[in-house]
Amino acid sequence: MRVISSSLILSSLLFASIASAAPNGKAGPVWRAAEKMRPAQLELLEQLVNIDSGTGDVAGGQKVSLIVADRLRALGMTVELLKAEAPNLPDNVVATLKGTGKGRLLLIAHTDTVFGPGTVAKRPYRTDATRAYGPGVSDEKGGVVEGIFAIQLLRDRGFRDFAEISFLVETSEERGSPGTRALIDRLVRQADVELNLEPGDAPDVMTVWRKGSTAFKIDVKGRPAHAGVAPQEGRNAALELIHQIQLADSLPKTGDGLTANVTLMSAGARYNIIPEDASATINVRLREKQQGDVVDAFLQKNAGITLIPDTKVIVSHEAS
């Protein structure tokens, strides 16, 4: 993440009237106020980054949620810690702030990362002249910090020309938000505008849309047999899975943002047994929901084309 006063950028996006208070850009009072916040921003960023909070790390994730909740509560927001909708996940934070005007704004950020336990010990937070480094510094603990300080900037300037600001800080985004899907749907329906605090493209570009993601799982059922005594009696699920993956790789390349890539594979239980079970997960990125239907139909068709006799292929859609 770039070490800049992102609070100014976000605040200007939230309410255009604040931007009008800074007609000279970086010379304006809002920019100067945001610049003064930089040390405090980086201090909070360091605190959050130096806590391991990979998705499913309940202890670390809960520590981060509590820190965020306390910071938002200190800004005068009404804060709730809500249990995740899926097991083995930390609490989500929902904070609201009432204003005196019109317009309901929803901010969404997440505190879980893709990094495993012990990552912080290996490469903790650090900075150089222009950047901050560490697990989750950009995706997306930096966004959480931006949201907190944007709200603080509005509060410090006495800006209340909005009906309500809601801030959801969730804890399972990196796995498709299984802990907040219903919550996100409810909050989005209550808002007039939603801003996602994921990092955009450099330099300082606001991203107005992103591709969606989903996953398909291919499960193959074969027949186990001893690999030395009677391999001919077996039906190798691993070989059929390889066949299905090769078929999947021939998915038509449409050129409109649809991609499908095998990301997980597993097969077998013991080294001397012909695998009875094998599975693979295909990560799909798409621009339109209908593209997922194209992939589903393609994989289901392939499931009926087996190379290894007596194996069964099941394709399931892991919606996200």
Predicted feature descriptions by range:
Residues 1-6, 162:
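Positively charged n-region of N-terminal signal peptides that target proteins for export
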Residues 7-17:
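Bacterial N-terminal signal peptides
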Residues 22-26, 43, 53-54, 63, ...:
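Metal-dependent amide/peptide-bond hydrolase catalytic core
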Residues 22-135, 153-162:
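Acidic/His- and Gly-rich active-site-bordering loop/insert found
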Residues 47, 149-156, 243-249:
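Short glycine/serine- and small hydrophobic-enriched flexible loop segments
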Residues 131-145, 226:
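Glycine/serine-rich anion-binding loops at beta->alpha junctions
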Residues 140-213:
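Acidic/histidine-rich catalytic neighborhood of metal-dependent amide-processing enzymes
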